[in-house]
Every structure is written in structure tokens, then in C-alpha cells.
Amino acid sequence: RQRQMCIRDRAYGRECCMRGLKTYYIKATELRDRFQKAVQRGNTSRVVSSLVKPSCLIVDEVGRCVCDRPCTDLFFDVVDRRYEKEGPNAMVLTSNIAPSGWDEFFTGDDTLLCALDRLFDKASVFVMRGPSYRGRGLDTYSVEAVPQAVKVRGIQPEGM
């Protein structure tokens, strides 16, 4: 299944692939859903391992969904295991929300802080500001409503 990625995610992921690195892309909502299903089915270790395995893990739209305590714990497990992993272990997290605001979306005492500590230990942080590029090529039209139907050349509109 092909995934739509933001330009920055696609560029980084593509570069990783060009260098022979296994790359996996997932939206934060999909990640939360995978974690919830794993908890229900009792296969959390398998799901966490599958997210630790790729050389590059891209999680898009962090902070667009609320994660309960088990999901937050699993997110930490992924971050922790990737942090300790030998070899390439890049993680790309994209968000329109600053990491200082992520605590509204992750549940748990210091679990998120521990994950962020590991994420930012060796991180390169890119802050991008400015207008969105989405929708720049849109055609826009102005439509004006006519307050009342009028009779034109002897033709009467329906309902009059």
C-alpha cells in the first residue's frame, strides 16, 4: 500500500532508501491503532520489534491523536530500543505541535519525558515556519446567490 508522505518526509525517506537503508513510514494515528490492537491481541513485543527493525522510522503527524497509557508505554519502548540499537537507527517525527505540547496527547507520568530525552539526545531538529504550500495551485471561484428567481423572456421559473 503506497502512503502519501509530506515532501520533507518523502525526501528523507527516499534518501535513506537510496543509501540502502530499510525505511518505514507510518502516521501517528495508524501507530496508535497498531499499538491498541497489539495490546488486545497480546503481541506487543512483535509489533515493537517490527518498528525497531527498520534503519529509519518516520512517524508523521505526532500529536494529532491521543494515546492512552499502554500506547504511550509502547511508544517509549520503540524509542528506547531504537536508541539502544546498534547501527543506523534514525527516527523522523513530524508535527505541527511543538514537543512541549505533546504531553496533551501522550498519557503517562514521565514516560513521554523519558522518550523525548532519548529522541533529542542525538537529534537534529528542523523547525519550519511559514505559509503552507498545500492548495497553492487551487482555482478559486466566487459565486453570488440571486435573492429571488426572476421571469426571463416569458419563461416562468418552476414553483412560481
Regions found by a protein language model. Give the residues of each.
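Short, small-residue-biased leader/transition segments that mark boundaries at the very start
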Residues: Q2-I7
